[in-house]
């Protein structure tokens, strides 16, 4: 809505965080917010069960996220508002208020994973995907059109990089 965007612009925010709060964590790891599901043609984006449905009881099953407003649209909004984007990515934990589901970080903590070595540290391949998602988001924002993710951004209509400088990791994680 143009009126809301104009009201936000009048506030002159220095940055805009997205997505907010527990939505990034999901009810569980499977339905966490994943930025890659929010880019590309809007009609081809998957839907996700919304964390704010409170529970998986039948009366809330139709409370979904459509991803019609995805990371690409969010970065465009930040450009319009003339503020820095602060995208937030999941850190491998579900909402700790609801549960304790975590992705094992180190290969030695996982019985099924041989891992990926980075600077002498062996991470589980499952956790490495979170690292790769962050690197891919940076490429989507800052890469030129010859890169995979920079090329997607360019094909969506934004040839110039977004010049991302901030990145949020996780939300209200305790004991992490």
Task: State the predicted function of each range.
Residues 1-176:
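Non-catalytic accessory regions flanking glycosidase/transglycosidase catalytic cores in CAZymes
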């Amino acid at each position: 809505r143009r009126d809301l965007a104009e009201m936000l612009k009048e506030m002159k925010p220095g940055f805009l965080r997205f997505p907010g709060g527990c939505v990034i964590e999901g009810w569980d790891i499977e339905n966490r917010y994943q930025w890659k599901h929010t880019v590309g043609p809007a009609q081809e984006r998957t839907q996700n069960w919304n964390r704010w449905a409170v529970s998986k009881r039948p009366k809330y099953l139709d409370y979904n996220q459509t991803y019609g407003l995805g990371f690409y649209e969010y970065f465009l909004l930040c450009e319009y508002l003339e503020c820095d984007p602060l995208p937030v990515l999941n850190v491998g934990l579900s909402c700790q208020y609801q549960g304790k589901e975590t992705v094992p970080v180190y290969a030695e903590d996982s019985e099924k994973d041989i891992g990926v070595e980075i600077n002498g540290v062996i991470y589980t391949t499952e956790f490495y995907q979170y690292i790769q998602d962050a690197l891919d988001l940076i490429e989507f924002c800052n890469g030129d059109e010859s890169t995979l993710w920079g090329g997607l951004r360019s094909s969506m209509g934004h040839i110039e990089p977004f010049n991302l400088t901030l990145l949020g990791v996780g939300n209200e994680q305790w004991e992490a």
